[in-house]
Regions:
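Gly/Gly-Pro- and Ser/Thr-rich, intrinsically disordered tail segments characteristic of DNA damage-repair
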Residues: 1-285, 289-292
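DNA-contacting surface of Y-family translesion DNA polymerases
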Residues: 8, 229, 237-387
Protein backbone atom coordinates (compact mmCIF):
# COMPACT_ATOMS: atom_id res chain seq x y z
CA UNK A 1 0.00 0.00 0.00
CA UNK A 2 1.33 3.42 -0.98
CA UNK A 3 2.32 5.68 1.92
CA UNK A 4 0.30 8.85 2.15
CA UNK A 5 1.58 12.39 2.51
CA UNK A 6 -0.82 14.82 4.13
CA UNK A 7 -0.46 18.51 4.79
CA UNK A 8 -2.42 20.63 7.23
CA UNK A 9 -2.38 24.31 6.32
CA UNK A 10 -3.40 27.09 8.72
CA UNK A 11 -3.76 30.73 7.70
CA UNK A 12 -1.84 32.96 10.09
CA UNK A 13 -4.23 34.91 12.38
CA UNK A 14 -6.72 34.81 9.51
CA UNK A 15 -9.31 37.40 10.57
CA UNK A 16 -6.64 39.84 11.72
CA UNK A 17 -4.65 39.29 8.52
CA UNK A 18 -7.69 40.05 6.36
CA UNK A 19 -8.29 43.30 8.24
CA UNK A 20 -4.62 44.30 7.86
CA UNK A 21 -4.48 43.52 4.14
CA UNK A 22 -7.64 45.52 3.50
CA UNK A 23 -6.01 48.49 5.22
CA UNK A 24 -2.87 48.02 3.07
CA UNK A 25 -0.95 47.05 6.21
CA UNK A 26 1.49 44.19 6.77
CA UNK A 27 -0.28 41.46 8.83
CA UNK A 28 3.05 40.42 10.38
CA UNK A 29 4.02 43.87 11.69
CA UNK A 30 0.69 45.53 12.48
CA UNK A 31 -0.72 45.39 16.00
CA UNK A 32 -4.42 44.64 15.51
CA UNK A 33 -7.26 42.77 17.20
CA UNK A 34 -10.59 41.75 15.72
CA UNK A 35 -13.30 42.48 18.29
CA UNK A 36 -16.61 44.30 18.59
CA UNK A 37 -15.77 47.10 21.01
CA UNK A 38 -19.38 48.34 20.89
CA UNK A 39 -20.11 45.56 23.35
CA UNK A 40 -18.54 45.39 26.77
CA UNK A 41 -14.79 44.87 27.21
CA UNK A 42 -15.63 41.27 28.11
CA UNK A 43 -16.15 40.58 24.41
CA UNK A 44 -13.80 37.90 23.03
CA UNK A 45 -11.23 38.90 20.42
CA UNK A 46 -11.77 36.73 17.36
CA UNK A 47 -8.15 37.22 16.29
CA UNK A 48 -4.94 38.89 17.42
CA UNK A 49 -2.17 39.73 14.97
CA UNK A 50 1.16 37.88 15.40
CA UNK A 51 3.11 40.99 16.41
CA UNK A 52 0.60 41.81 19.17
CA UNK A 53 0.64 38.20 20.41
CA UNK A 54 4.37 38.65 20.99
CA UNK A 55 3.52 40.95 23.91
CA UNK A 56 1.93 38.07 25.82
CA UNK A 57 -1.63 38.38 24.51
CA UNK A 58 -3.37 35.10 23.68
CA UNK A 59 -5.20 34.52 20.43
CA UNK A 60 -8.56 34.27 22.21
CA UNK A 61 -8.21 37.00 24.81
CA UNK A 62 -11.10 39.12 25.98
CA UNK A 63 -10.81 42.77 25.04
CA UNK A 64 -10.26 43.89 28.63
CA UNK A 65 -7.30 41.49 28.85
CA UNK A 66 -5.77 43.16 25.79
CA UNK A 67 -6.31 46.58 27.39
CA UNK A 68 -4.70 45.42 30.65
CA UNK A 69 -1.71 43.76 28.99
CA UNK A 70 -1.01 46.75 26.76
CA UNK A 71 -1.28 49.06 29.79
CA UNK A 72 1.30 46.92 31.62
CA UNK A 73 3.62 46.97 28.60
CA UNK A 74 3.30 50.75 28.33
CA UNK A 75 3.89 51.26 32.06
CA UNK A 76 7.20 49.43 31.69
CA UNK A 77 8.03 51.32 28.49
CA UNK A 78 7.34 54.63 30.24
CA UNK A 79 9.64 53.68 33.12
CA UNK A 80 12.41 52.75 30.67
CA UNK A 81 11.86 55.73 28.32
CA UNK A 82 14.15 58.79 28.37
CA UNK A 83 12.87 61.12 31.09
CA UNK A 84 10.23 58.51 31.94
CA UNK A 85 8.00 60.05 29.28
CA UNK A 86 6.29 58.55 26.22
CA UNK A 87 6.07 61.04 23.36
CA UNK A 88 3.60 59.23 21.13
CA UNK A 89 2.17 55.86 20.17
CA UNK A 90 2.15 53.50 17.21
CA UNK A 91 0.49 50.29 16.08
CA UNK A 92 3.37 49.63 13.64
CA UNK A 93 5.44 47.15 15.62
CA UNK A 94 8.92 47.77 14.13
CA UNK A 95 8.49 51.46 14.92
CA UNK A 96 7.49 50.68 18.52
CA UNK A 97 10.48 48.39 19.01
CA UNK A 98 12.93 50.89 17.50
CA UNK A 99 11.70 53.93 19.43
CA UNK A 100 11.60 53.47 23.25
CA UNK A 101 9.66 56.75 23.61
CA UNK A 102 6.60 55.39 21.80
CA UNK A 103 3.69 53.71 23.54
CA UNK A 104 2.40 50.41 22.20
CA UNK A 105 -0.90 50.97 20.40
CA UNK A 106 -3.21 48.71 18.40
CA UNK A 107 -6.12 48.82 15.97
CA UNK A 108 -9.48 47.34 16.99
CA UNK A 109 -11.27 46.07 13.87
CA UNK A 110 -14.95 45.07 14.08
CA UNK A 111 -15.58 41.48 12.90
CA UNK A 112 -17.08 40.87 9.45
CA UNK A 113 -17.81 37.15 9.27
CA UNK A 114 -19.47 37.09 5.85
CA UNK A 115 -16.46 38.95 4.46
CA UNK A 116 -14.03 36.43 5.98
CA UNK A 117 -15.99 33.61 4.32
CA UNK A 118 -15.50 35.35 0.96
CA UNK A 119 -11.75 35.53 1.62
CA UNK A 120 -11.69 31.87 2.64
CA UNK A 121 -13.40 30.98 -0.65
CA UNK A 122 -10.78 32.96 -2.56
CA UNK A 123 -7.99 31.06 -0.77
CA UNK A 124 -9.73 27.72 -1.39
CA UNK A 125 -9.55 28.51 -5.11
CA UNK A 126 -5.75 28.68 -4.74
CA UNK A 127 -5.71 25.18 -3.25
CA UNK A 128 -7.75 23.97 -6.23
CA UNK A 129 -4.99 25.12 -8.60
CA UNK A 130 -2.80 22.35 -7.17
CA UNK A 131 -5.06 19.69 -5.61
CA UNK A 132 -8.41 18.19 -6.67
CA UNK A 133 -11.42 18.87 -4.39
CA UNK A 134 -11.70 15.19 -3.42
CA UNK A 135 -8.24 15.46 -1.84
CA UNK A 136 -9.04 18.61 0.18
CA UNK A 137 -10.90 18.61 3.50
CA UNK A 138 -11.72 22.07 4.92
CA UNK A 139 -11.38 21.73 8.70
CA UNK A 140 -12.40 25.30 9.50
CA UNK A 141 -12.63 28.70 7.82
CA UNK A 142 -8.84 29.09 8.03
CA UNK A 143 -7.53 25.53 8.07
CA UNK A 144 -7.52 22.65 5.56
CA UNK A 145 -6.14 19.15 5.20
CA UNK A 146 -4.82 18.02 1.82
CA UNK A 147 -3.68 14.62 0.61
CA UNK A 148 -0.84 15.46 -1.78
CA UNK A 149 0.35 11.86 -2.23
CA UNK A 150 -0.55 11.59 -5.91
CA UNK A 151 0.63 15.09 -6.85
CA UNK A 152 4.32 14.87 -6.00
CA UNK A 153 5.21 12.98 -9.17
CA UNK A 154 2.98 15.25 -11.24
CA UNK A 155 4.75 18.41 -10.10
CA UNK A 156 8.17 16.77 -9.72
CA UNK A 157 8.42 18.25 -6.23
CA UNK A 158 9.04 17.04 -2.71
CA UNK A 159 6.22 17.40 -0.19
CA UNK A 160 7.95 20.40 1.36
CA UNK A 161 8.47 22.09 -2.02
CA UNK A 162 4.83 21.66 -3.02
CA UNK A 163 3.60 22.85 0.36
CA UNK A 164 5.78 25.95 0.18
CA UNK A 165 4.65 26.63 -3.40
CA UNK A 166 1.00 26.58 -2.33
CA UNK A 167 1.62 28.85 0.66
CA UNK A 168 3.59 31.36 -1.42
CA UNK A 169 0.78 31.41 -3.99
CA UNK A 170 -1.68 32.24 -1.19
CA UNK A 171 0.65 35.02 -0.05
CA UNK A 172 0.98 36.39 -3.60
CA UNK A 173 -2.77 36.19 -4.24
CA UNK A 174 -4.05 37.53 -0.92
CA UNK A 175 -1.17 38.96 1.11
CA UNK A 176 -1.83 36.39 3.85
CA UNK A 177 0.80 33.90 4.96
CA UNK A 178 0.29 30.45 6.45
CA UNK A 179 1.92 27.70 8.49
CA UNK A 180 1.81 24.04 7.55
CA UNK A 181 2.45 20.60 8.97
CA UNK A 182 3.25 17.45 7.01
CA UNK A 183 2.87 13.82 7.99
CA UNK A 184 1.93 10.31 6.85
CA UNK A 185 -1.52 10.65 8.45
CA UNK A 186 -3.97 13.42 9.31
CA UNK A 187 -3.07 13.43 13.00
CA UNK A 188 0.67 13.84 12.50
CA UNK A 189 0.13 16.57 9.90
CA UNK A 190 -2.12 18.43 12.34
CA UNK A 191 0.25 18.07 15.30
CA UNK A 192 3.23 19.06 13.15
CA UNK A 193 1.39 22.28 12.34
CA UNK A 194 -0.04 22.97 15.81
CA UNK A 195 3.15 22.25 17.77
CA UNK A 196 6.07 21.74 15.42
CA UNK A 197 5.57 24.79 13.19
CA UNK A 198 5.69 27.08 16.23
CA UNK A 199 9.31 26.08 16.83
CA UNK A 200 10.49 26.22 13.21
CA UNK A 201 12.22 29.45 12.13
CA UNK A 202 10.17 31.38 9.58
CA UNK A 203 11.67 31.96 6.15
CA UNK A 204 11.91 35.39 4.52
CA UNK A 205 8.18 35.29 3.76
CA UNK A 206 7.11 34.26 7.25
CA UNK A 207 6.38 30.69 6.13
CA UNK A 208 6.78 27.92 8.71
CA UNK A 209 6.61 24.24 7.70
CA UNK A 210 7.14 21.32 10.09
CA UNK A 211 7.16 17.60 9.38
CA UNK A 212 6.61 14.51 11.55
CA UNK A 213 6.55 10.77 11.06
CA UNK A 214 5.75 8.19 13.74
CA UNK A 215 9.32 7.90 15.01
CA UNK A 216 10.13 11.63 15.04
CA UNK A 217 6.78 12.24 16.76
CA UNK A 218 7.77 9.87 19.55
CA UNK A 219 11.28 11.30 19.84
CA UNK A 220 10.22 14.93 19.84
CA UNK A 221 6.77 15.02 21.41
CA UNK A 222 6.39 12.07 23.78
CA UNK A 223 7.66 14.33 26.57
CA UNK A 224 5.88 17.50 25.40
CA UNK A 225 3.65 19.33 27.86
CA UNK A 226 0.91 20.42 28.26
CA UNK A 227 -1.27 17.65 26.86
CA UNK A 228 -3.83 20.22 25.75
CA UNK A 229 -1.46 21.26 22.95
CA UNK A 230 -2.37 18.00 21.20
CA UNK A 231 -5.32 17.68 18.83
CA UNK A 232 -8.51 16.41 20.52
CA UNK A 233 -7.13 16.65 24.07
CA UNK A 234 -9.13 19.24 25.99
CA UNK A 235 -8.82 20.35 29.60
CA UNK A 236 -11.26 17.68 30.77
CA UNK A 237 -9.20 14.87 29.23
CA UNK A 238 -5.94 16.38 30.47
CA UNK A 239 -7.21 16.77 34.04
CA UNK A 240 -8.48 13.20 34.12
CA UNK A 241 -5.19 11.85 32.76
CA UNK A 242 -3.10 13.90 35.18
CA UNK A 243 -5.24 12.72 38.09
CA UNK A 244 -4.08 9.20 37.18
CA UNK A 245 -0.40 10.07 36.78
CA UNK A 246 -0.26 10.62 33.00
CA UNK A 247 1.17 13.96 31.92
CA UNK A 248 2.51 13.32 28.40
CA UNK A 249 1.69 11.34 25.27
CA UNK A 250 4.58 9.06 26.19
CA UNK A 251 2.86 8.30 29.51
CA UNK A 252 -0.34 7.39 27.65
CA UNK A 253 1.54 5.16 25.20
CA UNK A 254 3.30 3.34 28.05
CA UNK A 255 0.00 2.94 29.89
CA UNK A 256 -1.55 1.31 26.81
CA UNK A 257 1.01 -1.53 26.90
CA UNK A 258 1.00 -2.06 30.66
CA UNK A 259 0.52 -5.55 32.04
CA UNK A 260 -2.88 -6.67 33.31
CA UNK A 261 -1.65 -6.53 36.91
CA UNK A 262 -0.25 -3.00 36.59
CA UNK A 263 -2.19 0.09 37.66
CA UNK A 264 -1.38 1.75 34.34
CA UNK A 265 -2.70 -0.45 31.56
CA UNK A 266 -5.06 -0.29 28.59
CA UNK A 267 -8.05 -1.20 30.76
CA UNK A 268 -7.56 1.98 32.83
CA UNK A 269 -7.77 4.14 29.70
CA UNK A 270 -10.97 2.44 28.55
CA UNK A 271 -12.41 2.82 32.05
CA UNK A 272 -11.67 6.56 31.95
CA UNK A 273 -12.70 7.35 28.38
CA UNK A 274 -14.80 4.48 27.06
CA UNK A 275 -14.54 3.83 23.33
CA UNK A 276 -12.74 7.17 22.88
CA UNK A 277 -9.72 5.57 24.55
CA UNK A 278 -8.98 3.86 21.23
CA UNK A 279 -8.47 7.24 19.52
CA UNK A 280 -6.36 8.51 22.42
CA UNK A 281 -4.13 5.41 22.33
CA UNK A 282 -3.71 5.62 18.56
CA UNK A 283 -2.74 9.27 18.80
CA UNK A 284 -0.30 8.60 21.62
CA UNK A 285 1.57 6.29 19.23
CA UNK A 286 1.18 8.66 16.25
CA UNK A 287 -1.39 6.49 14.47
CA UNK A 288 -4.52 7.67 12.64
CA UNK A 289 -6.36 5.33 10.25
CA UNK A 290 -8.93 7.91 9.09
CA UNK A 291 -8.34 9.35 5.61
CA UNK A 292 -9.78 12.38 3.86
CA UNK A 293 -12.07 10.04 1.92
CA UNK A 294 -13.35 8.63 5.23
CA UNK A 295 -13.96 12.13 6.60
CA UNK A 296 -15.88 13.17 3.49
CA UNK A 297 -18.00 9.99 3.58
CA UNK A 298 -18.95 10.38 7.26
CA UNK A 299 -22.66 10.83 8.00
CA UNK A 300 -23.70 11.38 11.64
CA UNK A 301 -26.25 8.98 13.11
CA UNK A 302 -28.08 11.81 14.86
CA UNK A 303 -29.07 15.27 13.70
CA UNK A 304 -29.36 18.43 15.75
CA UNK A 305 -30.98 21.81 15.20
CA UNK A 306 -29.59 24.82 17.03
CA UNK A 307 -30.95 28.23 17.92
CA UNK A 308 -28.76 30.69 19.81
CA UNK A 309 -28.73 34.28 20.98
CA UNK A 310 -25.97 36.44 22.47
CA UNK A 311 -27.30 38.59 25.31
CA UNK A 312 -25.88 42.10 25.60
CA UNK A 313 -26.36 42.29 29.39
CA UNK A 314 -27.39 40.05 32.35
CA UNK A 315 -31.04 38.91 32.04
CA UNK A 316 -33.45 38.16 34.89
CA UNK A 317 -35.83 35.20 34.76
CA UNK A 318 -38.66 37.01 32.95
CA UNK A 319 -36.39 38.34 30.21
CA UNK A 320 -34.70 34.95 29.87
CA UNK A 321 -38.14 33.33 29.59
CA UNK A 322 -38.98 35.62 26.65
CA UNK A 323 -35.73 34.65 24.91
CA UNK A 324 -36.50 30.96 25.54
CA UNK A 325 -39.97 31.49 24.04
CA UNK A 326 -38.51 32.99 20.87
CA UNK A 327 -35.97 30.17 20.56
CA UNK A 328 -38.65 27.51 21.16
CA UNK A 329 -40.79 29.03 18.40
CA UNK A 330 -37.86 29.08 15.99
CA UNK A 331 -36.88 25.48 16.76
CA UNK A 332 -40.47 24.22 16.49
CA UNK A 333 -40.92 25.86 13.08
CA UNK A 334 -37.62 24.36 11.94
CA UNK A 335 -38.69 20.88 13.09
CA UNK A 336 -42.04 21.17 11.31
CA UNK A 337 -40.36 22.42 8.14
CA UNK A 338 -37.97 19.45 8.17
CA UNK A 339 -40.72 16.94 9.18
CA UNK A 340 -38.80 15.92 12.30
CA UNK A 341 -39.50 15.31 15.99
CA UNK A 342 -37.08 15.33 18.93
CA UNK A 343 -36.71 13.41 22.17
CA UNK A 344 -33.97 15.60 23.70
CA UNK A 345 -33.61 19.29 24.47
CA UNK A 346 -30.30 20.93 25.43
CA UNK A 347 -30.12 24.44 26.88
CA UNK A 348 -26.77 26.17 27.38
CA UNK A 349 -26.81 29.28 29.57
CA UNK A 350 -24.33 32.07 30.12
CA UNK A 351 -20.67 32.43 31.01
CA UNK A 352 -20.92 29.72 33.64
CA UNK A 353 -20.89 27.04 30.94
CA UNK A 354 -23.90 25.43 32.59
CA UNK A 355 -25.48 22.87 30.28
CA UNK A 356 -28.78 21.19 31.09
CA UNK A 357 -30.18 18.19 29.19
CA UNK A 358 -33.69 16.81 29.46
CA UNK A 359 -34.67 13.52 27.82
CA UNK A 360 -38.32 13.52 26.75
CA UNK A 361 -40.70 10.59 27.31
CA UNK A 362 -42.45 11.27 24.00
CA UNK A 363 -40.85 12.82 20.91
CA UNK A 364 -42.22 16.28 20.13
CA UNK A 365 -42.10 19.22 17.77
CA UNK A 366 -44.42 21.38 19.88
CA UNK A 367 -43.13 24.84 20.75
CA UNK A 368 -45.33 24.78 23.86
CA UNK A 369 -43.73 21.58 25.12
CA UNK A 370 -40.26 22.91 24.45
CA UNK A 371 -41.05 26.21 26.15
CA UNK A 372 -42.32 24.37 29.24
CA UNK A 373 -39.11 22.36 29.36
CA UNK A 374 -36.93 25.44 28.90
CA UNK A 375 -38.83 27.21 31.67
CA UNK A 376 -38.18 24.23 33.92
CA UNK A 377 -34.46 24.42 33.16
CA UNK A 378 -34.40 28.19 33.62
CA UNK A 379 -36.28 27.92 36.90
CA UNK A 380 -33.80 25.34 38.17
CA UNK A 381 -30.72 27.25 37.01
CA UNK A 382 -31.57 30.92 37.14
CA UNK A 383 -34.61 31.77 39.28
CA UNK A 384 -32.71 31.78 42.56
CA UNK A 385 -30.27 34.34 41.05
CA UNK A 386 -32.60 36.90 39.42
CA UNK A 387 -30.00 39.67 39.14
Amino acid sequence: MKDHTYICCDLKSFYASVECVERSLDPMTTNLVVADKRRTEKTICLAVSPSLKAYGISGRARLFEVVQQVAEVNAKRKWDAPGHQLTGSSWHDPEVRQNPSLALDYIVAPPRMAHYIDWSTKIYSVYLKYVAPEDIFPYSIDEVFMDITNYLDTYKMTARELTRTIILDILKTTGITAAAGMGPNLYLAKVAMDIGAKHVPADEYGVRIAQLDEMSYRRQLWTHRPLTDFWRVGKGYANKLEAHGMYTMGDIARCSIGNAGDYHNEELLYKLFGVNAEILIDHAWGWEPCTIADAKAYKPENKSIVSGQVLQCPYDFQKARLVAREMADALALDLVDKRLVTDQLVLTVGYGFQIAVLDLRNPTRSDGNMLDLKQQILADRIAEHPE
